[in-house]
């Protein structure tokens, strides 16, 4: 059974499950070079911010991308 969990579940760029705007799909016919203009050291987030972000994300809604690009569990 397939499920679309809506905007509360985003399963990544290669997955159609739960996209906010499913009609807007990124397509490209030509290879575009990536240009990096500057380099900076990686910023580390404080542990309390990482924990708060994990609690408020998709996992808090009980929705993640399962096998076959379906929302798992399908409780939307």
UniProtKB/Swiss-Prot annotation:
Metallothioneins have a high content of cysteine residues that bind various heavy metals. One of its GO terms (molecular function) is metal ion binding. This is Metallothionein-like protein 1. Belongs to the metallothionein superfamily. Type 15 family. Disulfide bonds: none annotated. Coiled coil: none annotated. Keywords: Metal-binding, Metal-thiolate cluster. The keyword Metal-binding applies.
């Amino acid at each position: 059974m397939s499920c679309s969990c809506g905007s509360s579940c985003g399963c990544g760029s290669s997955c159609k499950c739960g996209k906010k705007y499913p009609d807007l799909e990124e397509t490209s016919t030509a290879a575009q070079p990536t240009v990096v203009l500057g380099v900076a050291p990686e910023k580390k987030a404080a542990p309390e911010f990482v924990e708060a972000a994990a609690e408020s994300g998709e996992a808090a809604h009980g929705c993640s991308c399962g096998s076959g690009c379906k929302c798992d569990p399908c409780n939307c």
